[in-house]
């Protein structure tokens, strides 16, 4: 464990205090935690003799959108310091105090229930019990997102413990239940509950209004030392405690369900101290659907109480979530062996079936984007779309619109990890809208049918992926170098949008960039920037920033050194991959294809080798700087975010503009054609076809003086990135009757400049230039 150095931190404000510690808002003076720039951090300070390892274990291994992100923890001589995401917002208990009627609107309550049930269902699936669900431990951040805080009371329970608990409650409980049609049973059961409570010395002296774990800042308290570190401990807040916990039985997943019901009643303005037959009274103003949901939560007998994942399929939740609510999709946690979990290392629950148990299938409401497979038209033998890791991509029609259909191979349909990846991509795509993100249109998903085709339908991109384009059409970039800036800017804008949505792509490669062209691609043709569009695709490995800690995945040859070494993935990981894409724009081939993934991972991750592919000699200085900054070994030395990269690309684009401003008109009489038949008629005929005056602009091309680009005056010398040359004249083509020996340009300062050219025998023809300034400066990047 690291040592906490107070000198590294600036304390900003006090957040809260419990019986065993406090929470403060801090800022690290260097601004970085785990190589990630973070403005503020919430630090929970706990006395060492009261510290529970469970809390850090859970926070470290469970990463969900609705749970504050855990960074790390440290210690000094007396305390443990837990560094977590600082949430700018207020807890529900305090918000309720400001409400005139002391309650939230039902629509808002239902939305928060959906978030909370999804989060708790995921925790329970991995044997984590929160044990202190209440309004004080639910925070609305500045964007109105619900966050579940305080895992100080949480515990981890395996299956044997749960079965033992069920046996105990069966033998000791006289079958209590909350059937509203059987009030006599309820009264008898509550009498039993009261007797048990009266005999429980731990409960007798507790005031119903006091939190057993201190304040909402979340430092756990234990009533009896013998229960410490055990799910048998009576921990939590009394008014929210399940009846079995009050009777000193262990807390289980069902206990969280009861606490959830109590929390909802408080959200709705109810009084938890008012009970009927031991059950909090449900406010009359709630809808029948919400009341029915509460009746599934507030059941005295835990065996008859619903599980959290069963609540996911209640019509109240299905109506809100559907299958396209993505933000709580979590990372499979792997706990240490000493946690003594059975089968947890191999547990790969099917995410689709866990969200929608079969017995609730009739309540499923199909989202707008889900289609029937029969609605798609495509040729099964068509291979135009290509193939991927998990299936083929085919060109097809949906409602007479050209689309790309991404299939999951039937052989993969039963593989749970593939199903999760496929479904996860649908969840992400269905919520994204940006001109540089491939537009999701529909999906075909069938639950529990192995033979069903699973597919994602998106817009058809006519240009294929960037890998294919660079390998087969790199001459287009050589003749239209401004397109490099355009395509890279498109990619950067797409990734910047993802990062603003708190999504990290994690697999940014040339295969996952698709292109669209407005006209046919020909090697020697000249194109405008607006004729090319690049869009980012393939989000199967993408993750929420709060979920991405210690996630690994992606294409090895594009992965950053820190990720290969197991460090957290963040925005800087995508920036590293982008650096390799910039490099690829000049090398035209994927990086490091001569090495195996294993060799590549070793060479890149090793600080001594620190391998990167060699930058081609033809890469201009500004691009070299961008490449080396993006793939720097130290993430802190990379650009802060993609907005910085976009600005750098914009600056490179402006150099084209500045170069163009030095280009001079070529008037036909100034072209000396002493020994050939190529004359002004060629330029004049071009001008006539364009319905413009015969005035042109010249620009040298690359490092070669044998070619010259001619611009029509209609372009008005606007930036090259938006207005490319109309025609390029190659002075060495054999179809010319003879060679131009000299080309005079009228420069801005009215001096004449002559440019050396080569004849077909590569003999240099001396020039008579009197002023060669700016000629080489006009070269493209």
Curated annotation (Swiss-Prot):
One of its GO terms (molecular function) is ATP binding. InterPro entries: Kinase-like_dom_sf (IPR011009), Prot_kinase_dom (IPR000719), Protein_kinase_ATP_BS (IPR017441), Ser-Thr/Tyr_kinase_cat_dom (IPR001245), Ser/Thr_kinase_AS (IPR008271), Ser/Thr_Kinases-Pseudokinases (IPR051681), Tyr_kinase_AS (IPR008266). GO terms for biological process: adenylate cyclase-activating G protein-coupled cAMP receptor signaling pathway; cAMP-mediated signaling; cell fate specification; positive regulation of kinase activity; regulation of aggregation involved in sorocarp development; regulation of cell fate specification; regulation of positive chemotaxis to cAMP; signal transduction. Keywords: ATP-binding, Developmental protein, Kinase, Nucleotide-binding, Phosphoprotein, Repeat, Serine/threonine-protein kinase, Transferase, Tyrosine-protein kinase. The keyword ATP-binding applies. In the N-terminal section; belongs to the protein kinase superfamily. Ser/Thr protein kinase family. In the C-terminal section; belongs to the protein kinase superfamily. TKL Tyr protein kinase family. Positive regulator of gsk3/gskA activity required for cell pattern formation and a downstream effector of carC. The kinases, gsk3/gskA, zakA and zak2, form part of a signaling pathway that responds to extracellular cyclic AMP. The pathway has a role in transcriptional regulation; required to direct prespore/spore fates during development. ZakA negatively regulates prestalk differentiation by regulating expression of ecmB. 'Zaphod' is a fictional ex-president of the galaxy with 2 heads. This is Dual specificity protein kinase zakA. It comes from Dictyostelium discoideum. The lineage of its organism: Eukaryota, Amoebozoa, Evosea, Eumycetozoa, Dictyostelia. The gene is zakA.
């Amino acid at each position: 464990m690291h040592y906490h150095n107070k000198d590294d931190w600036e304390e900003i404000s006090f957040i809260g205090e419990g019986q065993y510690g406090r929470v403060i808002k801090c800022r690290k003076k260097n601004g970085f935690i785990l190589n990630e720039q973070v403005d503020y951090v919430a630090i929970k300070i706990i006395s060492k003799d009261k510290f529970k390892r469970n809390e850090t274990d859970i926070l470290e291994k469970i990463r969900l959108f609705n749970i504050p992100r855990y960074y790390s923890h440290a210690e000094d001589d007396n305390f443990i310091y837990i560094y977590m995401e600082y949430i700018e917002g207020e807890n529900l208990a305090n918000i309720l105090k400001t409400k005139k009627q002391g309650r939230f609107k039902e629509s808002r309550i239902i939305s928060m229930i959906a978030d909370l049930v999804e989060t708790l269902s995921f925790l329970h699936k991995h044997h984590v019990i929160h044990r202190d669900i209440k309004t004080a431990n639910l925070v609305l951040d500045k964007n109105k997102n619900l966050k579940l805080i305080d895992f100080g009371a949480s515990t981890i329970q395996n299956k044997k413990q749960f079965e033992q608990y069920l046996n105990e409650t069966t033998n000791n409980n006289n079958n209590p239940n909350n059937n509203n049609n059987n009030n006599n049973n309820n009264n008898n059961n509550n009498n039993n509950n009261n007797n048990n409570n009266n005999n429980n010395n731990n409960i007798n002296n507790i005031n119903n209004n006091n939190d057993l774990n201190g304040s909402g800042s979340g430092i756990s308290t234990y009533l009896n030392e013998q229960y410490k570190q055990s799910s048998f401990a009576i921990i939590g807040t009394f008014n929210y405690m399940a009846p079995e916990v009050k009777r000193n039985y262990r807390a289980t997943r069902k206990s969280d369900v009861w606490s959830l019901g109590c929390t909802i009643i408080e959200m709705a303005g109810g009084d938890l101290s008012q009970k009927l037959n031991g059950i909090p009274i449900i406010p009359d103003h709630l809808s029948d659907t919400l009341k029915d949901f509460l009746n599934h939560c507030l059941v005295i007998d835990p065996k008859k109480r619903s599980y959290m994942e069963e609540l996911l399929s209640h019509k109240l939740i299905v109506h809100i979530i559907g299958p396209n609510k993505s933000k709580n999709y979590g990372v499979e946690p792997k706990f240490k062996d000493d946690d003594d979990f059975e089968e947890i290392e191999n547990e790969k629950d099917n995410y689709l079936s866990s969200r929608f148990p079969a017995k609730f299938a009739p309540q499923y409401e199909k989202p707008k984007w889900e289609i029937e497979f029969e609605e798609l038209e495509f040729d099964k033998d068509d291979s135009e779309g290509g193939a991927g890791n998990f299936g083929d991509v085919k060109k097809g029609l949906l409602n007479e619109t050209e689309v790309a259909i991404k299939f999951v191979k039937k052989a993969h349909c039963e593989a749970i990890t593939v199903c999760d990846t496929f479904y996860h991509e649908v969840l992400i795509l269905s919520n994204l809208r940006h001109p540089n993100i491939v537009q999701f249109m529909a999906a075909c998903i069938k639950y529990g049918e192995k033979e069903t085709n699973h597919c994602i339908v998106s817009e058809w991109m006519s240009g294929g992926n960037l890998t294919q384009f660079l390998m087969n059409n790199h001459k287009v970039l050589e003749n239209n170098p401004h397109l490099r800036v355009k395509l890279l800017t498109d990619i950067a804008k797409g990734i910047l949008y993802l990062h603003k949505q708190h999504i990290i792509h994690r697999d940014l490669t040339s295969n996952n960039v698709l292109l669209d062209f407005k006209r046919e691609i020909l090697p020697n043709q000249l194109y405008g920037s607006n004729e090319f569009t690049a869009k980012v695709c393939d989000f199967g490995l993408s993750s929420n920033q709060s979920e991405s800690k210690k996630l690994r995945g992606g294409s090895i040859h594009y992965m950053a050194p820190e990720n290969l070494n197991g460090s957290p993935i963040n925005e800087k990981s995508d920036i590293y991959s982008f650096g390799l894409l910039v490099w690829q724009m000049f090398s035209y081939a994927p990086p490091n294809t001569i090495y195996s993934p294993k060799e590549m991972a070793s060479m890149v991750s090793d600080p001594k080798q620190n391998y990167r592919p060699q930058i081609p000699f033809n890469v201009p200085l500004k691009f070299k700087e961008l490449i080396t900054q993006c793939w720097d070994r130290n993430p802190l030395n990379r650009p802060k975010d993609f907005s910085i990269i976009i600005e750098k690309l914009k600056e490179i684009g402006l150099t084209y503009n500045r170069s163009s401003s030095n280009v001079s008109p070529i008037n036909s009489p100034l072209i000396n054609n002493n020994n050939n038949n190529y004359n002004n008629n060629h330029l004049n005929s071009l001008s006539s076809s364009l319905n413009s005056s015969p005035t042109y602009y010249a620009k040298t091309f690359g490092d070669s003086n044998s070619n010259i680009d001619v611009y029509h005056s209609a372009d008005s010398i606007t930036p090259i990135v938006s207005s490319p040359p109309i025609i390029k004249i190659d002075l060495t083509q054999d179809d010319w009757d003879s060679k131009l020996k000299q080309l005079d340009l009228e420069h801005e300062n009215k001096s004449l400049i002559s440019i050396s050219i080569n004849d077909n025998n590569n003999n240099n023809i001396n020039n008579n230039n009197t002023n060669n300034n700016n000629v080489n400066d006009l070269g493209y990047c």
